Amino acid sequence: DTQTENVIDFFDPLPSSSYAVFDSGYKYMFDRFNNEFRYIPLNGDIAGLMARTSINQFSWFSPAGASRGAINGAVKLAFNPSQSQRDLLYPKRINPVVFQPGSGIILFGDKTGLGVQSAFDRINVRRLFLTVEATIERAARAQLFEFNDVITRSNFLNIVEPFLRDVKAKRGITDFVVVCDETNNTPDIIDSNPVSYTHLTLP
């Protein structure tokens, strides 16, 4: 149908990226500043769902569905995809926003704009790793200009490992390994003074 094809045709040329999120359209809402109803793009709402999920739960929870994906202030949708339309949109990286009786208007997809199959084609996985990477970066920055010795490496591990245990306890990851010892800090690396670590996380 024309609506589905128009949405797919718009997003198809856009580059593949796990840092982007595509949705299916516009909501009809009241514009109190101009005292009239108008159609507004949903991308601001999708960003708001992610912020609300981070505040009320954690960044690694999906912002979609009846529990966390409710679109506020929407009277109706310009395009309310049916099941068959959703089946066409979702493989094309487009997250449908739909009206569901009993739930209202909700985000009904969790895809990033990544064009290949990967763990990072899910919004919650990408946001999990953004959170983990930022914390590890801060921990590493705190060790700048310190000696590459057991004490410095222990300080780094004492920041990172409890954080990852907490993420695991809160259902963000299933397991993790952090290696920061003599196996990946060889004498050559120690002589040149950077601290090397290996981090493996299973979402």
Model-found features: residue ranges?
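Structured, hydrophobic secondary-structure cores that serve as assembly/anchoring elements
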Residues: D1-L200
